[in-house]
Design a protein with these regions (language model features):
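Flexible loop/turn segments at secondary-structure boundaries
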Residues: 133-135, 161-165, 207-213, 282-286, ...
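Soluble non-cytosolic domains of exported or imported proteins
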Residues: 33-34, 87-90, 133-137, 180, ...
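Alpha-helical structural signal in soluble globular domains
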Residues: 42, 188, 192, 196, ...
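Flexible, acidic glycine-rich loops studded with aromatic residues
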Residues: 327-334, 339-345, 351-480
């Protein structure tokens, strides 16, 4: 329904009455035809209605005057959607799925005129597929959530200490038995996401969170430590990180192995412009004792493990650039080492601890906001945030609950800038069943705050729209 559409369209003019619609959708613009089944398939799941691919019902028309990311919806006489490119078309189809209603088997839409486009270009959900294994069928549901709520990126955390959930021919022992995605699965994810305008972002977590790599191929990736040396570290938040969790930054075999895995990831995800490399929570103390790392540091004039950390991030991000993709890393490297990393690298600022967003912006990096508070969903964590807190936040704010974060007592705010590309919800260490309700609700609120950066509604006004919007997502992703 028009008044419950989220994210809120830029311009909406409502008129009295409704337009009764023939349950069909068609276009005479050949480039748009392949995307119309996205609407018909979604309408079947949301409304239980068969919408034909035919003329005489909803019209989809090409309008060269519209920017690629914009669309118009006109339901004054029937329902016509206008766009100039795939991006705007898919936003129009998602809006139409929110705008139409079915009653007594009849399809109709309130009479209105909508003009709409997004403000922030990066609107994302991240899902942890490692700590809790999820079958392939669940991944499709996250893609559906992104499509209907106009989030245009889905960041998939495939690799961590517990599992390696990607296929690999270069290192066949890496894929966790019975708990990894096949090449066919990945092709399915890519095709489904592409049809819906969702960019998939695969992640290879290095140099930390790499216990699985070291366990399967120690001769390739592991540090070589003297017998009896314990390089385990305990973080300020009490997290114990073993030296077994970090790859060696000194031996060539580790770098060759990382390159081989990255090449496989690029082949698996041909349409993904980004590759995420992790880059935080690493037990770099181990590098002080590793014979290969010490030799590398001496040969390259690297002063300490922190400098090596930044230099390593610089090397692996350069690999990604050489492969024709753009690297993304977590905010994990120190300010002192920023000069070692290509400024075209995108940094996700989340903790406000390793390096502050103000310093990252000053250094010239582009930023994604993943402020732990209110954008994290973590199982077993006593603090949890929902639409209320996300509405109160904005894309230029960083907050945290943790006493060691610089954003705890005094949230960090930066001036509006195009360097801040957008933001993402992060769902960690949860099963699908544990996180999906939070994902649906929080992604809806995040999309509202990124589609238009200026806040439009108070909590009561927002909730009048929120319930129906989330209900339609739930119907779209429910098992049949």
């Amino acid at each position: 329904m028009i008044h419950t559409i989220l994210p809120t369209p830029k311009k909406t003019e409502c008129f009295e009455g409704v337009s009764i619609l023939v349950p069909a959708i068609g276009t005479d613009h050949a480039a748009f035809e392949e995307y119309l089944p996205v609407f018909t398939g979604s309408a079947k799941r949301i409304f239980g209605l068969n919408v034909a691919l035919a003329e005489g019902g909803i019209r989809v028309e090409y309008d060269a005057a519209l920017p690629e990311n914009a669309y118009r919806l006109d339901s004054r006489e029937g329902l016509t959607l206008y766009a100039s490119a795939k991006e705007g078309l898919l936003y129009a189809l998602a809006t139409a799925l929110h705008a139409v209603k079915v009653k007594n088997g009849e399809l109709f839409c309130e009479k209105a005129l909508i003009e709409d486009w997004p403000e922030k270009s990066y609107r994302a959900l991240m899902v942890d597929l490692v700590r809790e294994w999820m079958p392939a069928s669940r991944v499709y549901k996250y893609i559906d959530v992104c499509f209907l709520q106009k989030l245009n990126h889905l960041h998939l955390h495939f690799v961590d200490d517990q599992r390696f959930t990607l296929p690999s021919k270069a290192f066949p022992l890496l894929p966790t038995p019975e708990e990894h995605y096949t090449e066919e699965d990945i092709r399915g994810f890519c095709a489904y996401a592409k049809e819906r305008g969702i960019t998939l972002i695969p992640e290879l977590e290095i140099p930390g969170h790499a216990r699985h790599l070291n366990r399967c191929y120690p001769e390739v990736f592991a540090n070589e430590l003297p017998e009896g040396v314990d390089a385990t570290i305990v973080t300020e938040e009490g997290l114990t990180i073993s030296a077994k969790n970090i790859v060696c930054a000194g031996k060539q075999s580790a770098m060759d192995g990382i390159r081989a895995i990255l090449q496989e990831i690029c082949a698996l995800f041909p349409d993904s412009p980004y590759i995420h490399l992790g880059g935080e929570e690493a037990a770099i103390k181990a590098w002080n004792y590793c014979t290969h790392c010490q030799a590398y540091m001496k040969a390259h004039g690297i002063e300490d493990e922190y400098d090596l950390y930044s230099e390593f991030i610089g090397r692996v991000t350069d690999m990604v650039f050489e492969l024709g993709r753009t690297p993304i890393v977590w905010e994990g490297f120190p300010k002192k080492g920023s000069h070692r990393i290509n400024r075209n690298t995108v940094v996700i600022a989340w903790e406000s601890h390793y390096q502050l967003v103000t310093d990252l912006l000053e250094a010239g990096f582009r930023i994604i906001n993943a402020s732990w508070q209110p954008l994290y969903i973590v199982d077993g964590f006593e603090l949890r945030w929902g639409p209320k807190e996300i509405l109160e936040w904005n894309v230029y704010n960083w907050q945290h609950w943790w006493e060691h974060s610089a954003a705890t007592l005094n949230p960090i705010h930066v001036s509006p800038t195009e360097q801040v590309l957008g933001a993402q919800i992060c769902a960690w260490q949860t099963t699908f069943e544990q996180n999906i309700n939070f994902v649906m609700e929080n992604c809806t609120a995040l999309s509202e705050r990124l589609w238009t950066v200026k806040r439009l509604w108070n909590l009561e006004q927002y909730h009048k729209r929120h319930h129906e919007s989330v209900r339609r997502i739930a119907r779209l992703i429910q098992d049949r």
